[in-house]
Amino acid sequence: MSESYKNAGVDIEAGYEAVKRMKKHVERTKRIGAMGGLGGFGGMFDLSELPYKQPVLISGTDGVGTKLKLAFAMDKHDTIGIDAVAMCVNDVLAQGAEPLFFLDYLAVGKADPVKIEEIVKGVAEGCVQSGSALVGGETAEMPGLYTEDEYDIAGFSVGAAEKDGIVTGENISEGHLLIGLSSSGLHSNGFSLVRKVLLEDAGLNLDETYAPFERPLGEELLEPTKIYVKPVLEAVKSGKIAGMAHVTGGGFIENLPRMMPDGLGVEIDIGSWPVPPIFPFIQEKGGLKSEEMFNVFNMGIGFVLAVKEEDMTDVIQTLENNGEKAYLIGRVKAGSGVVFGGAGLS
């Protein structure tokens, strides 16, 4: 053991202990195609073991943003890894890809093996939910860059789709309907605004329970991002999905146009789905306009699929048969961007 390195803030032995603690969680993520074990220089995956004829690899990378600040404040680290996986695999899913494997990057101010295990346990849980093998990663101790209690996490997902089955949105046309899938809450976006409104301006306490919630505010805010992989892949198999969008940073206004061909926009029917209480709670505490809410948050819809009108019932049935709550939330119209109807904006 290097005492000089330890005195400089890097504890190699603690790093070794963290890796030992990770192994049982990584083992949970084994799937067909995964090769090798933890500790190699590169993660391996044998695509030939899967029944693809013309596979196209589709990748995505993302992080969790300032939701981490709440994990630090609550000293709760077992779900933030789920968020890291969800942000990546839901993006890959939006192209119709089956997530295959995942890598994580964890940078810490101080290597605490117990805390690192909690974080990686969450990553492994996200991988299990999405069917991804956790084939590798990096844990870097960076004293001076982060405080001892701080860390950052990012992930990288690789999935595959048949070449003729990639969902690009290019076949969306006027009259297609939009199916929205319920979110679990805030997911992993908008937390800088959340902290400003609820903690700085309103002075609320993360450890207290406020109406209408039945658990402390911090736990409500840390609810992990929903992973949509399994129900959506079942719907994709039908060949009836023309386009998909993962509703993340920028909310409806930024993300729905990303799946639209030029010359088309969407009309969203406000009131066509139940909005989780965390959103009106934030809106009321911050005096925020509805338009701003839809430009920052998912507002209760975390994933959107575009389908032909005649396919809507079958697709919703498939999603609900696989445990997902699905709602008809709007339609595709000539134009651009996102307009809101129904109950309107205030």
Curated annotation (Swiss-Prot):
Keywords: ATP-binding, Cytoplasm, Ligase, Nucleotide-binding, Purine biosynthesis
Family annotation (CDD domains): PurM
GO cellular component: cytosol
Pathway the protein contributes to: Purine metabolism; IMP biosynthesis via de novo pathway; 5-amino-1-(5-phospho-D-ribosyl)imidazole from N(2)-formyl-N(1)-(5-phospho-D-ribosyl)glycinamide: step 2/2
Keyword Chaperone: no
GO MF annotation list: ATP binding; phosphoribosylamine-glycine ligase activity; phosphoribosylformylglycinamidine cyclo-ligase activity
Domain of life, per lineage: Bacteria
Enzyme Commission number: 6.3.3.1
Keyword rRNA-binding applies: no
One Pfam family it belongs to: AIRS_C
Protein localization: Cytoplasm
Chief localization: cytoplasm
Catalysed reaction, written as an equation: 2-formamido-N(1)-(5-O-phospho-beta-D-ribosyl)acetamidine + ATP = 5-amino-1-(5-phospho-beta-D-ribosyl)imidazole + ADP + phosphate + H(+)
Disulphide bridges, residue numbers: none
GO biological process, one term: 'de novo' IMP biosynthetic process
Protein family membership: Belongs to the AIR synthase family.
Name this polypeptide is given: Phosphoribosylformylglycinamidine cyclo-ligase
